[in-house]
Design a protein with these regions (language model features):
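A short hydrophobic beta-strand segment most commonly corresponding to one strand
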Residues: 62, 82, 109, 124-141
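Short, conserved beta-strand element in jelly-roll/cupin
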Residues: 63-66, 75-92, 132-134
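Structural motif
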Residues: 89-91, 115, 125
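Short acidic-glycine-tyrosine-enriched beta hairpin
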Residues: 96-112
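Short strand-connecting beta-turns/loops that link adjacent beta-strands
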Residues: 56-57, 78, 97, 123-124
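Asparagine-centered strand-capping/turn motif at beta-strand->loop junctions
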Residues: 119-121
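A short, N-terminal "cap"/entry segment at the start of jelly-roll beta-barrel domains
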Residues: 1-59, 72-73, 143-145
């Protein structure tokens, strides 16, 4: 059995992000220009996520996570997703491709319907920029089975 969630706030909370605040998530939504330094100066070095772009075609979310944090294994039925690594290192597992280490400046693409999982493996907080369908459905395996 699979579980489906398309609410960004609950996805982040259920993936282990210690604090998620919807006002913070939307604080920089559709900002013309913002730097990672400005985001970190405002939000700090803890775990956080901000949606910097949102419209009927796509969304962009900057996600900062601590070493060892990541997300649950999941896929998206509606759309592909891609990420730009803004700072640090992540381990990416992609079904059919295996596990890879990605670092600052790398770009990762995952086709819709492909299981994947992400973990921060840096010694310090790492940041990725996720670009996908607005409020995309995340499909998870039911952990109770």
């Amino acid at each position: 059995m699979k579980k489906i969630d398309s609410d960004l706030e609950s996805v982040l909370i259920n993936d282990g992000m210690s604090e998620v605040n919807w006002d913070t998530l939307k604080k920089y939504q559709n900002t013309t220009n913002i730097s990672l330094k400005e985001l970190r100066d405002d939000l700090g070095l803890g775990s956080w996520a901000v949606r910097t772009a949102f419209n009927e075609n796509y969304q962009g979310v900057v996600i900062q996570q601590q070493p060892g944090e990541g997300n649950r294994k999941h896929y998206y039925p509606e759309a592909d997703e891609n990420w730009v690594i803004m700072d640090g290192e992540f381990e990416w597992w992609i079904d059919g491709k295996g596990t890879m280490k990605v670092t600052t400046g790398d770009i990762v693409n995952v086709k819709r319907g492909t299981w994947h999982q992400i973990t921060c493996i840096s010694d310090t907080p790492a940041v990725r920029y996720a670009i996908n369908w607005p409020d995309v459905s995340h499909v998870y395996e039911d952990e109770d089975e």
